[in-house]
Amino acid sequence: MTTVIDATMAYRFLEEATDSSSSSSSSKLESSPVDAVLFVGMSLVLGIASRHLLRGTRVPYTVALLVIGIALGSLEYGAKHNLGKIGHGIRIWNEIDPELLLAVFLPALLFESSFSMEVHQIKRCLGQMVLLAVPGVLISTACLGSLVKVTFPYEWDWKTSLLLGGLLSATDPVAVVALLKELGASKKLSTIIEGESLMNDGTAIVVFQLFLKMAMGQNSDWSSIIKFLLKVALGAVGIGLAFGIASVIWLKFIFNDTVIEITLTIAVSYFAYYTAQEWAGASGVLTVMTLGMFYAAFARTAFKGDSQKSLHHFWEMVAYIANTLIFILSGVVIAEGILDSDKIAYQGNSWRFLFLLYVYIQLSRVVVVGVLYPLLCRFGYGLDWKESIILVWSGLRGAVALALSLSVKQSSGNSHISKETGTLFLFFTGGIVFLTLIVNGSTTQFVLRLLRMDILPAPKKRILEYTKYEMLNKALRAFQDLGDDEELGPADWPTVESYISSLKGSEGELVHHPHNGSKIGSLDPKSLKDIRMRFLNGVQATYWEMLDEGRISEVTANILMQSVDEALDQVSTTLCDWRGLKPHVNFPNYYNFLHSKVVPRKLVTYFAVERLESACYISAAFLRAHTIARQQLYDFLGESNIGSIVINESEKEGEEAKKFLEKVRSSFPQVLRVVKTKQVTYSVLNHLLGYIENLEKVGLLEEKEIAHLHDAVQTGLKKLLRNPPIVKLPKLSDMITSHPLSVALPPAFCEPLKHSKKEPMKLRGVTLYKEGSKPTGVWLIFDGIVKWKSKILSNNHSLHPTFSHGSTLGLYEVLTGKPYLCDLITDSMVLCFFIDSEKILSLQSDSTIDDFLWQESALVLLKLLRPQIFESVAMQELRALVSTESSKLTTYVTGESIEIDCNSIGLLLEGFVKPVGIKEELISSPAALSPSNGNQSFHNSSEASGIMRVSFSQQATQYIVETRARAIIFNIGAFGADRTLHRRPSSLTPPRSSSSDQLQRSFRKEHRGLMSWPENIYAKQQQEINKTTLSLSERAMQLSIFGSMVNVYRRSVSFGGIYNNKLQDNLLYKKLPLNPAQGLVSAKSESSIVTKKQLETRKHACQLPLKGESSTRQNTMVESSDEEDEDEGIVVRIDSPSKIVFRNDL
């Protein structure tokens, strides 16, 4: 405000120094600094009116503003009666300091322009930009300076002539950018012209400052000139990068505060400009340009969702206001420079030199483009002759040149630059700005049309017509649904049609199918290129959506989007966006150091996990984005040859991503688990935010309550962002405590194990024990996958024989003293612990612990002896089978019988038995005892020898005990042998679209519980549960499922099938109705490595009669609301609970 007041005081001083009429004196007395605000408001109103009236015409908006400004200036400075208060405001703004004028408008305009540029296009066009901005400006300055010196009659020296040449060599970014956006030029051409105008504006200012110093009498040698140029240019780049890095780091600490984020961008742009221009003596223009491009490259993904939209709209509004003011003010300055001067007659003689100077400027532009054309064709995207013509014709001049000429006028009136020279500089510059905007700006669209550069290519035209045809079909379907009403009756389709102008062709008729069934499927290379481009745009849009939803981080999003940008430049060949991701998706070389004892394993693990986690995010996001884009392309084009080609290319690229995820899953599954955990956490928190917002809409909660709940969820989101879960090896004591076997181990037994120095981590391919060797101890598996293989066991039906978290391996062999039944080899990174046989056998003195150990050993035998049934069943589910009434462990004496009904299966753990009713042969332990009237699919169909069958698998209804025997009988009728392992549909598959009213109904269904909360039921059921004493098997089941001893009632609410419906429902966990838009990136658990193979196996696996199958689950599913999606997925447990910690635990 001080500056405005000072300008007003200067204005009054000038008025008092001149002879003025009484009317002007009266106006002077009424002048007020507040009149400057009136000019701003009037300019904005005129700008709004111009934009509204000129919409749909060929007159550029900026040209209209310049004409309005000249008209206002002419009325104020040229007419006998001035404009009063408005005139006072015009004079206040007109007398503003040129440097202040640049400092007010340039930072906002330059930052908005450079921030909106696409990074990959900047990279590709950078060589062309630099050529036009540096050599181009120098060539233009030399040409203009030489022509002015030779042909103009003002007896200027070379320094003054070159000063005018440098001043007029800058194509103004404000004018050029505004014009290109309005005309809709191609992206490639817009990037070159816009980037050149940004860069050469800074270069021209530097050249101008250099020649101005020389013209003012400051002699400089070559060393000082080079030093000055390096300081101005390199210093500007360095300051821009410094401010960019500092502000982007600051942005990382701002969470969901759009106002602060936008304010930071404003503050940093102006502060960087001031620091460079006034404090460091560098170029403020180059500084802000560098800052904006740095933001475009590294901070674009920092603004997500509403913040990004708000930022875009804000800077669009700032650019619009600044453009409106600066072009009207430029017109005022031009009018004042021409009319309000004592040298009008002299300038009148200079009009012909003004037009001659305009011709020189066009010729110099032709020389610049012509000389650099061979190099321009070799860099970036290249340049053809049509684009060269547009490049020549788009060399507009604007506010920057005017501000520089004003500074020359202010510096004039001395022995070096006369006052007349300063006035001529302003006159020529204003005239050139007017002519380039009026002539070049108004005719650029005509030139584009003349060169046929505004015509849509045939493929795009066909796509447009096809889209209109599909829009017509959708409009007809919508009319069928909405056109008839019980109360109001039918609607009139012709009237509806008259309002839908978008469905009509150029001749006003409704569009018809444009392809006749074949054109859309033609193999035209241009059409194929266009479809690839649209496909990649869809992939990039999905990346943005995933970033907004928190599925990927900012760094990951930058990598993914850069790969798409690079692929967009090569759409003439097959899809290649995966090629740009390959350097980021691999196992790091230092992963091999995990085998080494030289480098600390924890350090190597930390860096390897960081790299693999990022690679998994990239791969999963790539697969999801391509899946969605393929579906969208298929929905849009249907069955077409050209669509099939692009879809096949996408699927081929996805194979490599799938292979990498499978490799990580088999080698380091903990990484995928952390990725999945983070994404699930974010999705759940977003679901809660949506639920809270819906509560506010329906009015069930008050504003204060909503704010409290919203802050609580935002706290969780902030914690997830700043302290995400990571993979870290847990402490041995924690691992032992969380293992299900620990419930049977006395504290005195566990304490020495917790302080053991043994290394718990085994890499892939390590053999834990070999088949036939003497049992030396038991292996506890805490995390990872262990593969088994055996020569004597008939495991032909086991497609993927593995054990995972919670397994106790070798326990049966230790209890019986028999050799190990199979080889055990780690199939991924495994966290495990070895306990000697003597320590385990010492626990058998307690009968309860002894029974538990036998039950625990039976879990592994089920998978070894009956892989057809139990191979894909997780350990926690088998423990649920053992811990319920579905199993019974019994010790038999000689002569007793063991009966196996049709819905059961038995395991002979100790002793010998003989089957009754068939060939009597001695059966030794271990053996699976199946009923003779059961489904034959459960029996081993391999061509194994008779000894194998006798030893490990028998069929009979009754068995006679020959010696003391121990057996456990399982009732698998409730288990459901025909049940495949249900999984939630992969989130790589795009979610089904659901209307907003369906989502609203699902939310309202959730609200019902708010009105009838069971306040006392928890306490009552808790008292009943506390009275119950859990067996060791039940406690082990809790540890296996939840990772710790838990409140049974609370867990039964979420996993009711385990406690309420016993085993029959423990495989199915009810899924919360999530927002379809909040799908999760797939990160499968280790049990899904061969899901496809498991499903194929079950096609051949027969089923026991399920007489005992309960109808509970059927009743439960029937009672579910019809509002729920019929394809609602199933949430499936991950076999091993994730050992996830937070970074503050490091």
From Swiss-Prot:
Gene3D superfamilies: 6.10.140.1330. One of its GO terms (molecular function) is sodium:proton antiporter activity. Keywords: Antiport, Cell membrane, Ion transport, Membrane, Phosphoprotein, Potassium, Potassium transport, Sodium, Sodium transport, Transmembrane, Transmembrane helix, Transport. It is a multi-pass membrane protein. Phosphorylated by CIPK24/SOS2 in complex with CBL4/SOS3. Changing residue 777 to E: In sos1-8; hypersensitivity to Na(+) and Li(+). It catalyses: Na(+)(in) + H(+)(out) = Na(+)(out) + H(+)(in); K(+)(in) + H(+)(out) = K(+)(out) + H(+)(in). InterPro entries: Cation/H_exchanger_CPA1 (IPR018422), Cation/H_exchanger_TM (IPR006153), cNMP-bd_dom_sf (IPR018490). Residues 986-996 have a biased composition (Low complexity). Changing residue 136 to E: In sos1-12; hypersensitivity to Na(+) and Li(+). The keyword Translocase does not apply. Residues 1109-1118 have a biased composition (Polar residues). GO terms for biological process: potassium ion transmembrane transport; regulation of reactive oxygen species metabolic process; response to hydrogen peroxide; response to oxidative stress; response to reactive oxygen species; response to salt stress; sodium ion transport. The keyword Lipid biosynthesis does not apply. Residues 981-1001, 1102-1128 are annotated as: Disordered. Belongs to the monovalent cation:proton antiporter 1 (CPA1) transporter (TC 2.A.36) family. Acts in electroneutral exchange of protons for cations such as Na(+) or Li(+) across plasma membrane. Involved in Na(+) and K(+) homeostasis. Required for cytoplasmic Na(+) and Li(+) detoxification by secreting them from the cytoplasm to the extracellular space. Regulates Na(+) content of the xylem sap. This is Sodium/hydrogen exchanger 7.
